[in-house]
Amino acid sequence: LNMNEDVLGKTEKEVLGWVEKSREEIEKLRLQEEFRREFLGNLSHELKTPIFSIQGYILTLLEGGLEDENINRAFLERASKGVDRVTGIIEDLDLITKIESEELKLNSTTVNVVDLAKEIVESLEIKAQKRNISLSLDWKRAGSQEINVLCDKDKIGQVLGNLINNSINYGVENGHTEVRFFDLEDNILIEVSDDGIGIKEEHLPRLFERFYRVDKSRTRNVGGTGLGLAIVKHLVEAHGQTIDVRSTEGQGSTFSFTLKKL
């Protein structure tokens, strides 16, 4: 009898454990569906906004434009930026599709990752200045500016670009973002660190999931598809490496990933 009770007790625990696990999986799927719907809504907005602007500028110019040629040129420049924005969204969607279908291919070459980071920082300097955020690089802890790695330059450039761009988007007035390099013998550790608004601890485990948004109030004025960090994670992992995040709300965030040194 005691043995039967033990078996029944064990079976009951197993069933309860299975029920709890199933409940967690269902909740996870529900949240994913919620995030997916929100993503599609955001995507529609992110595409419509620049397209309507482009259409407005082009119609004005087709009707003869304005007398001031400087304004006409400004219209063309804004339309060009709108096209770049739409192109960026389409490229993100194409990339995440390739990742999910395991069709992502790397074109690996020898890359000086410090020089690559400098290029990315310089390309985002004007945006950072508009938000009164300073950008800097610290390679001294790695011992050299000549840090060669074998990687896909465009893909790692996208990783750095996304991380630095996010740091600017969620930075604070008179804030600072720094890209740091550390020598780990066989690997190089790269950090993108800021003193911005930070992230609540409860959000960190899901931060790299597709469609996941930390807080609507945070992202309302930033835009984007919500795929950026998911893409970053996949691109780093495609190089056989890992990415991590440390963050404290109100104190800033540090994203770090490794690359194999040559």
Question: How should these model regions be labeled?
Answer:
Residues 62-70:
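Short acidic helix/loop segment immediately C-terminal to the autophosphorylated histidine
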Residues 81-89:
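Short alpha-helical segment of the dimerization/phosphotransfer core of two-component systems
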Residues 101-106, 144-151:
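Conserved micro-motifs of the catalytic ATP-binding
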Residues 167-168:
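Short helix-loop "hinge" at the ATP-lid/N-box region of the Bergerat-fold HATPase_c
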Residues 174-186:
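Short beta-strand/loop element within the Bergerat-fold HATPase_c
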Residues 199-213, 233:
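Short conserved segment of the HATPase_c
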Residues 240-241:
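Conserved glycine-rich
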